[in-house]
Amino acid sequence: MALLLCFVLLCGVVDFARSLSITTPEEMIEKAKGETAYLPCKFTLSPEDQGPLDIEWLISPADNQKVDQVIILYSGDKIYDDYYPDLKGRVHFTSNDLKSGDASINVTNLQLSDIGTYQCKVKKAPGVANKKIHLVVLVKPSGARCYVDGSEEIGSDFKIKCEPKEGSLPLQYEWQKLSDSQKMPTSWLAEMTSSVISVKNASSEYSGTYSCTVRNRVGSDQCLLRLNVVPPSNKAGLIAGAIIGTLLALALIGLIIFCCRKKRREEKYEKEVHHDIREDVPPPKSRTSTARSYIGSNHSSLGSMSPSNMEGYSKTQYNQVPSEDFERTPQSPTLPPAKVAAPNLSRMGAIPVMIPAQSKDGSIV
């Protein structure tokens, strides 16, 4: 009885071993962004597996918020690869003959969104097998920059830093001195694997060229730093120069303002003078015409008077023209009425006329 039971169990083990199986073990694959990931899935068939061959790849996204999605399928001797939009056109079977036992795929141009668990399922009735692969996409360190944070002067404290523009954690750093003795200062040894080295009481011996290499599991990058520790600068001279420069700038600004204001005053004065000139006022007559009209009026008045009646008049200064003639419109001089004697009036043809007079009491005389 015991021998029969052992024979049955042995036959079951042999039959299980001969069924469909995937020979590639489960694993985790790490690749850099932009590279191609090879996901292996090799299988063997047993003589009992007589059904149609179906191969299916699925993805379980890393955020665990989405259900498993089919990314590529082989069924009925046809390939279907347009199930998952994020991987459309980037996932392919590596073998042209999947019946040979190779269901491996390539995922090209890897992105961070491709991180997740991929599952390979092979079916050939009555055999069924599956295997999982964990894919991790990392970003290579790139754009590393080395620089000094602080003043590179003797006796001062500053920091030298190494910073990559991008790169997946964890990151490792390594500092080296490339010039002179190529030996790092003793006080820096504890920080040679850090992104920042703190420099205390700097000396000229620290001057030189340094390199920083930053790396992770998928790549590395490097930057160089030229450190030049110099004596302290003359800050008093710099301050004095800054003050003098400021004063000169203020003086220049003041001069510009003064010139602008002066020009405005001149323009304003010219406008006022221009507005004071009236076009509707005729210009004053010349001195010659004024003097001639004055002399002519005197001659006409005096021509009808006898010499005896001219005693009360002073001789007019014809050579002097009043200054007021230049300031106002010339006017004919007003002369007192001439007194003519009765004999002269008779000779001139005058006719005597009797004019009644009125006495003080109102009677006419």
UniProtKB/Swiss-Prot annotation:
Q: Name one GO molecular function term.
A: connexin binding
Q: Which residues, renumbered to this chain, carry the PTM Phosphoserine?
A: 297, 304, 306, 323, 332, 363
How does this polypeptide assemble, per the annotation? Monomer. May form homodimer. Interacts with LNX, MAGI1, DLG4, PRKCABP, TJP1 and CTNNB1. Interacts with MPDZ; recruits MPDZ to intercellular contact sites. Interacts with JAML (homodimeric form). Secreted isoform 3, isoform 4 and isoform 5 can interact with the extracellular domain of the receptor. (Microbial infection) Interacts with adenovirus subgroups A, C, D, E and F fiber proteins as well as coxsackievirus B1, B2, B3, B4, B5 and B6 capsid proteins.
InterPro entries in alphabetical order: EJ_Adhesion_Regulator (IPR052307), Ig-like_dom (IPR007110), Ig-like_dom_sf (IPR036179), Ig-like_fold (IPR013783), Ig_sub (IPR003599), Ig_sub2 (IPR003598), Ig_V-set (IPR013106)
**Signal peptide, first to last residue:** 1-19
Q: Where is this region: Disordered?
A: 269-343
Q: Which residues cross the membrane?
A: 238-258
Q: What protein name is recorded for this chain?
A: Coxsackievirus and adenovirus receptor
Q: Where is this motif: PDZ-binding?
A: 360-365
Disulfide-bonded cysteine pairs: these are 41-120, 162-212
Mapped to this chain, the residue ranges on the Cytoplasmic side of the membrane are 259-365
What functional role does this protein have?
Component of the epithelial apical junction complex that may function as a homophilic cell adhesion molecule and is essential for tight junction integrity. Also involved in transepithelial migration of leukocytes through adhesive interactions with JAML a transmembrane protein of the plasma membrane of leukocytes. The interaction between both receptors also mediates the activation of gamma-delta T-cells, a subpopulation of T-cells residing in epithelia and involved in tissue homeostasis and repair.
Q: Does the keyword Glycoprotein apply?
A: yes
